[in-house]
Amino acid sequence: MTSGTSRGPENESTSPGLPGSADKDLAGHADRVRRGYLLVSGLDYFADMLLTVTSVLLLQSLGMGSGAVFALIAAVWIVEGVSEIPTGVLADLLGRRASVAISFVLRAIGYSALFFSGNVYVAAAGVLLSALGGTFASGALEAWAVDETGAKDPSGLDRLFAQGKIAENAGLVLGTLTGAALGTLDLALPQIVAGLTCALAAVLSLRLMTGRRDPDRPPAAPEPQAAFAPRLRESFGEVMTGTRLTLRGDKVLIALILAAALLWLFRGIPGVQWTVVYEGLVGGNLLVLGAMRSVGSLLEIPLLGWTLSLQKRRASARRTVIVTASTAGALALVCAAAVKEPALSIVCYVCFSTAFGLCMPGVRAAMNERIDSGHRATVLSVASLFNSLFTGGGLILTGLAVGDLGSTALAWPLAAAGFGIAGLWVASLAVRPGTAPTTTTSTTGSTGPQEVRAP
């Protein structure tokens, strides 16, 4: 594929001072992109985490039973899953900035619906609309940051995603504590604040997500509005073909996607139950629940800084971090389900959630190393598709087997075993070099991808 920067003679200069100036401009642009990525990521998590303590309690207060809550959360994951590929195509077709802005607008509407309506069906529709909105940003923001910063090497990717995780954790902590505090006044109040935050984030994403022309994609020729639908179908076919060829040419990438999906599944099961499990243990105090949810994310910030410095010194450190974190997380979740002392159980659960957060930057960096830039957003959406379908299906099975959101005797030990095994699998793949050969397509048509370069 061609690069996103024209290399013709008319764009080159013989001035000896220009290369250094150009390097400074590129470095300054990368810094601006990184700051924009961190700010938008932080706002994204702040808005979502405003609801982490109160959302299930709000749905129950509207008359939704435990089984229905389990089914609704599973439906959220499934909606996200089936929407991932179409919205990934739109991200590549319409532009990643527009896709992220659409995501925030849809979530602003969905979150606000839960505030303005006391009807359980309207509330459920708002939850599903918010889930749909989330898929527009899935992969698009990440792909934009990787391409615009030029972070292609392992150390650059690890640094970008570690910093992104820190920004996400900052948003998570602030959002969780703010939502818990607002929830003590009214369970619906965090919803409207989340909606307003998403509206603000939509404006900021349009202002901040600027930069050079998308890499590996020539400028689109102007076309009439009526041609949009054919272009969408054509783009969908091209990207799906490119994704299929990329995955077929890189078995390690396929395995990474599947293993990461298992990590999300086994993190998702206790993630649904924790509010109900610990509400009685803390006497229904939402601020305590918010603090409990935030402690793990606060711990991640210095730990991520330490793991980043370790990875700079040792190339194999990524695997060490994932193995250690997944093993410790699995043991912690078993202890959280088994121990009778509430305080100890809370500490163990916090350790489990922290371990998951430490695994993810390395997993995301390993995937991005192996994805061709031209279809990065869509391939990342394919990964999110597997995450969503695995987790949604797993939650349905868990709901049928457990039946009660507050029961951990069966679900948490099984989730712990799966989490540990998936972590070891991911770790075995995360430091393998991308060696898949370049894959070309036949030239029988002009609409298919001309080349899919294996990273």
Regions found by a protein language model. Give the residues of each.
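Hydrophobic core of transmembrane alpha-helices in multi-pass small-molecule transporters
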Residues: G42, G110, Y121-A137, L344-L358
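Helix-loop boundary and gating motifs at the non-cytosolic
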Residues: G20-G81, G249-S297
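Symmetry-related core transmembrane helices of the 12-TM Major Facilitator Superfamily/SLC fold
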Residues: L189-R207, A411-S428
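C-terminal transmembrane bundle of multi-pass solute transporters/carriers
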Residues: T2-P9, F70, G81-D92, R97, ...
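C-terminal ends and interior cores of transmembrane alpha-helices
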Residues: V105-N119, T327-K340
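Juxtamembrane intracellular "pre-TM" segments in multi-pass secondary transporters
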Residues: E10, T14-R34, L208-I257, E451-A454
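Cytoplasmic helix-loop-helix junction between adjacent transmembrane helices
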Residues: V127-N169
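Conserved MFS/SLC helix-loop-helix module at the cytosolic interface between two early adjacent transmembrane helices
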Residues: E80-G118
